[in-house]
């Protein structure tokens, strides 16, 4: 299957099971922060097996960046991507995505669901427009937090972490529930950005609407 061929310039692990890829950028390639792309590995037998990944770099950058959660138990594309290194190639297919910035609000990310928000925050930070935005980032444990130092530097006190399986002193150690939302959100008449596992997103949609948020204010991947 056809696609734009890009070469891997650098790889590194940012957590135990999350790998960062820096890629060449095709001339004229465009995306909006928060959008992603269907990606396949440029190898015989792998080119037709596409998976969706989100770009985390600034659109103006000279290279592309993907941050990928590796699922070895799935024995699929991410397991193969774990073995890729500098000089290997990927194919970029259709650009897509409905998670784009609409205005200040709350961002709720679960695990690797942080990736579309990274590009958005980086762009807002560059433009000096991060004020009024809060990130609530849920992970199983402290070791699963992706790009923690950068997020802390950009958002400071507006970066809130929750952990579902590991109690960490000074941080919430439970799943995000209605009580959490009532404590954190004083105004439900604003934008709410949601990204993570389907159950995580679905539960937040339901709870936010029940607490007074307009369905039209919820931004998520349909």
What feature does the model see in each segment?
Residues 73-222:
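FNR/FR-type flavoprotein reductase catalytic core
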Residues 1-2, 222:
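Absolute protein N-terminus
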